[in-house]
Amino acid sequence: MRKLIIPLVIVGAYFLMQSSCEQNNQNIPYVPVNFDINLNLPSYTSLNFPGEHLIVQGGSKGIIIYRYTMDEFVVLDRHSTFDVTLGCHVAVESDGITLSDESECSDSKWIILDGSV
């Protein structure tokens, strides 16, 4: 009898653990991005100066291009990672260096340069 109880407990525990797991994969959609920008074109002139940003179409919800230095750019997708199912997007605050997602999501704010909060 004891030999029968132990395997039943193990099998029961296994099914109990499996039923408690949620299959809630919240991944940002994979969207390949491949484009070039010509800084001599009028639509990209704001990127000729460090500290400036530009929002362009592409990616999942758009792309933010930020000119960090004369030689470095930071490029981010605008899709908020808080709750992907809500479809919120990231915006650049008026100071030009802080990013935030919509208040309906998490109203989080972070620095565009390194992602620190």
Whereabouts are the PLM-identified features?
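Multi-pass alpha-helical transporter architecture, strongest
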Residues: E104-C105
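N-terminal pre-ligand scaffold of iron-sulfur
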Residues: E22-G96, S108-S116
